Amino acid sequence: MKILFVAAEGAPFSKTGGLGDVIGALPKSLVKAGHEVAVILPYYDMVEAKFGNQIEDVLHFEVSVGWRRQYCGIKKTVLNGVTFYFIDNQYYFFRGHVYGDFDDGERFAFFQLAAIEAMERIDFIPDLLHVHDYHTAMIPFLLKEKYRWIQAYEDIETVLTIHNLEFQGQFSEGMLGDLFGVGFERYADGTLRWNNCLNWMKAGILYANRVSTVSPSYAHEIMTSQFGCNLDHILKMESGKVSGIVNGIDADLYNPQTDALLDYHFNQEDLSGKAKNKAKLQERVGLPVRADVPLVGIVSRLTRQKGFDVVVESLHHILQEDVQIVLLGTGDPAFEGAFSWFAQIYPDKLSTNITFDVKLAQEIYAACDLFLMPSRFEPCGLSQMMAMRYGTLPLVHEVGGLRDTVRAFNPIEGSGTGFSFDNLSPYWLNWTFQTALDLYRNHPDIWRNLQKQAMESDFSWDTACKSYLDLYHSLVN
């Protein structure tokens, strides 16, 4: 099968979050499964700076962006058997960042038009075209409404993956003519309109042949008013083509036996290296070096979406216990300030690190006993899977991918891979935290068994790849 991915970011070239991880990993797994895979990404200035000497020029042409004629260069490289093509236009993509400009609508309108028009020129007409989030969600619409006259594109099947429904790409309806060069009929009849705006995500949901999300629970949740971001009734209407597939993690990269960022390696049969990493981490972040105290890790953006309003409200109560917490992250200044203040009040119990440090993050995943992740909503989440890979038990709010990946501790069977609570409130966070502390202190054999179960969980991309192939084969024989 010929499969083409089109996305706004993709590791290792450009990455701001989980979308970049997916584009960096899933195509590689599909190639291993015997498929011909290509990826189209924007050619950002950070790609030029880090990988420019590994990327070759292929061709260039002009793209009509409404009344504008814009330069489009095509560049190319091959990595892990995947052919990466890059759309080059320095005006749109040399901004020092991926998102956040006032003209993001124009930037990604150009990108989508260029990606479609590039397919014939690079001689890669896919059987299946996989687009991701709102930045590329107009492509299924454009293929059927603007480019339907191109015979080579007639049989292309499309899949839209929603990584985060909160970001929908809502713009003025004038963009249809001014940028995409299409008529207003589909806006006037309500197909593309939502809240008196052109909604790119709605277009993708209606026009893609299949819609996937990054976990089965999130696929269900976005059909409810609580999580549907005002598109729940559209998703319910299209529910027959909506499904969820849990993202994977790189099992080779996140491997406690070989991880180059760790001082000591370990496995599920011998956790002595984990204990040594714990002592090393305690020393590094300025906490007393104690093997007996439960060490809780947090690696996250400090936002309300991640549940940190509830954490801050619970923190004084939690820190009354004989416990240590190490936090790494940035975000809302109010939460940054709150954690910094608590660290001054409880210097032997809380280490607050308002920064981003890849090595420290890896050490937290590997060295801690518990990993706190009480997200208000979480389409998939990767941190809880990384933590489990290293025998660090997640404590999570039961939403989205957290519900699908963390098996809550069952005290009757002594089974599970972590701890969870259903109602996001200080009471239930504290109650679940107490359950975990009691198990850690009084039932070490059960705790050790949970660690082993967590480390044996299969979150590899090979597993996720099989689910995506089932989805693809439902469209392409």
UniProtKB/Swiss-Prot annotation:
UniProt GO BP: glycogen biosynthetic process
Positions with a binding annotation for ADP-alpha-D-glucose: 15
Pathway of action: Glycan biosynthesis; glycogen biosynthesis
InterPro entries: Glyco_trans_1 (IPR001296), GS/SS (IPR011835), Starch_synth_cat_dom (IPR013534)
Pfam families, per the entry: Glyco_transf_5, Glycos_transf_1
Record-linked CDD domains: GT5_Glycogen_synthase_DULL1-like (cd03791)
Keyword rRNA processing in record: no
Leading EC class: transferase
GO molecular function terms listed in the Swiss-Prot or TrEMBL record: alpha-1,4-glucan glucosyltransferase (ADP-glucose donor) activity; alpha-1,4-glucan glucosyltransferase (UDP-glucose donor) activity
UniProt name for this protein: Glycogen synthase
